[in-house]
Amino acid sequence: MPFINTKTTVSLSKSKKDSLTAEICRITRECLGKGENWVMTGFEDNASLFFQGDSAAVAYVEVKSFGTPSAAGTSQMTGKLCHLLSGELSIPADHIYVAYYPTDNWGWNGSNF
């Protein structure tokens, strides 16, 4: 039940979104212990983002999850997400922010967990 939304200045094809989704699901399983059946991803490409006054290759990733993941898990996930986006989208790791938003209120299938 994490929702992982990636905003980036880079243009993404459908096939790139599909491959990123597969990798994000793998990373989420490894770092947070959440399987692919519970992961939702979103992509907002061609976003108007600026970092250090520059709008070149930039990304902002939001990880919203039910419950609070461990600090070790989120630290590991940040490293892997930055590595993924750097490799796949040529975004420098120092131009990527990853923010975590845990919540105890998460709804699915008509009710809350």
Question: What are the functions of these language-model segments?
Answer:
Residues 1-113:
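Interaction-mediating elements
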